[in-house]
Every structure is written in structure tokens, then in C-alpha cells.
């Protein structure tokens, strides 16, 4: 089949809260982007059909190739989302949507592919020196959950992406304050993973733990209705709620620890890339937050980490971009 006959391609980036859809009408050209709340639809297929009905006027041809990035491990045909109610069979969904091919990949595999094609203005560098071209790149990012993956560029220019579930590693507190936060979380959960703190709901959990800290009993606090990640962040940046600022500082410190752990584990001299929608909301604060200092606080490996640049991804739809690149690789090479 001529390459032009594979367009439009149906792309999706499906997280725990929202599903983003788009139509790739030409290489790296995505149109009709829509964001739909997952909770509004009984199933993935229902959401896709609703999306396609909204794009009916723009569709000259029905898509026959699709690529979906989903925030959950892919282990065979049956897919169960980690942070929402959707479950689906890849093959049944392909048939239901009348697709010739449906590629389903982990969402942070898509993020890694997207990073391979990003330009300098898509990123904000936080410290470090320069990326080594063929060294591993670590990709992680807090959102509804916490994703982690690895991107390796071989000497011939080909790419290898290693998916992982690093967000579910056990959280290791760094100091007495983080021990207090961990103890609060441990009273609620059997396993306290990094994702418990480094996610949208994690900001709320950190705030709740800190609000019980001795000496903060009389500090101005948020009402129950205000306990959302967005409001905690806003109050922290406004400076009128010290406990919110401490929450955000603690969040960034914890992220620095995890990012350093991942960088050391992978030898990520190709850089660390922070994805997701949380950090770009407060990027100016993040640049001067405790993140970078904590990232480099690793004893004898401090100098090694000091040279590694950290980049915050600013691009709006990297999940869709990466899903498209993965599908292109599959159609060209019969593998991603």
C-alpha cells in the first residue's frame, strides 16, 4: 500500500483522567485534537466513536490505521487501565473501530518517541551541561500517575524504547520531613510507591501529611473543597499559604530524588526528561525549586549527576506525537 494511503491515522493518548485524540493527516501533522474525560464514557470504543463523530466533517476517509498510547502496562491482548475504569481487548477494539491495524503501546513509550523528535524550544533545561548523543535518556513524569521509560539512540540512528513501571517503586524518604510524610501515607496504604506522592493526588497527600505536622496546627489551611492539586499549586505560588509552599517544595524535592535514582540506574548521560501536565503549570518556580539541588545530592555520585541536564517537556501533545512516530516505525519496519 502506498504510504499516502495510510492517512488519516487515528491517534490517542489515554491517561487516567483524560483521553486525547487526534488525526495524523500527513507525517507529524496532527489535526482535530480533542480532549475527553475518561469518566464520561463507559468504554474506550465509546469514546473513540464519539470523537470520530465530532470530526465527521473533517474526515474525508475513515482511518484504517490507529495507534493508542495508554497509561498502563501492555501484556498481551487484554488491557486494564491502571487509573481509570476502562478495560478492553486490542483485537476486539480494532474490529469494532474497523481498523486494519491498531497499535497499542504504553504511554511513556510514546513520550520517549516524542522526545526523539523534539526541538530546543519544546524543552526547558534545568541545570546540567550537555546530553551525550548515544547515551540513555530517562523519561519520567507526574500526572494522574507517574510514568517512567528509557530511550536509547543507537549509533546507526535507530531508536530503542524500554517501557517500565518505575512509578511503582517503593518510596524512600530522604529526611525527617519526608519520613513524616511517608508515615502518614503508610497509615493509609499497604505499599507506599513513588507515585503516591509524585502525581496530582500526591500533592494532596503531601499537603494532608504536612498539615498534621507539629507546629503547623495554627497555620492557615485550605478547606476540604479546596484540596485539589491546582489550588494547592496556586496558593503555593501566591505565597499566602506557607503550608502550600512547603507542599510544593516537598513535591519537587521528592521528584529530584526519584529523577536522580532513575538517572543513576540507567546511566542517563543522555539527559532526564520530565513529562506530564503538572510541572509546566509552575515552570518558573520549578527552575528555582529544591528539585535540582536534591537531584545532585547523591554523595559520591553528586558530580556525575551535576553534569546531567534535566529537561521539562513544554510541548502540548507529546503523547499523540509519540503514538504517531511509533506507528510510522511499525508500518516501515514491522516493529516499534
Curated annotation (Swiss-Prot):
Its EC number is 2.7.1.2. Transmembrane segments: none annotated. Pfam families: Glucokinase (PF02685). ATP binds at residues 12-17. Keywords: ATP-binding, Cytoplasm, Glycolysis, Kinase, Nucleotide-binding, Transferase. It catalyses: D-glucose + ATP = D-glucose 6-phosphate + ADP + H(+). Disulfide bonds: none annotated. It comes from the Bacteria. One of its GO terms (biological process) is glycolytic process. One of its GO terms (molecular function) is glucokinase activity. It is found in: Cytoplasm. InterPro entries: ATPase_NBD, Bacterial_glucokinase, Glucokinase. CDD domains: ASKHA_NBD_GLK. Gene3D superfamilies: 3.30.420.40, 3.40.367.20. It is an enzyme of class 2 (transferase). GO terms for cellular component: cytosol. The keyword Transmembrane does not apply. Belongs to the bacterial glucokinase family. This is Glucokinase. It comes from Helicobacter pylori (strain Shi470). The gene is glk.
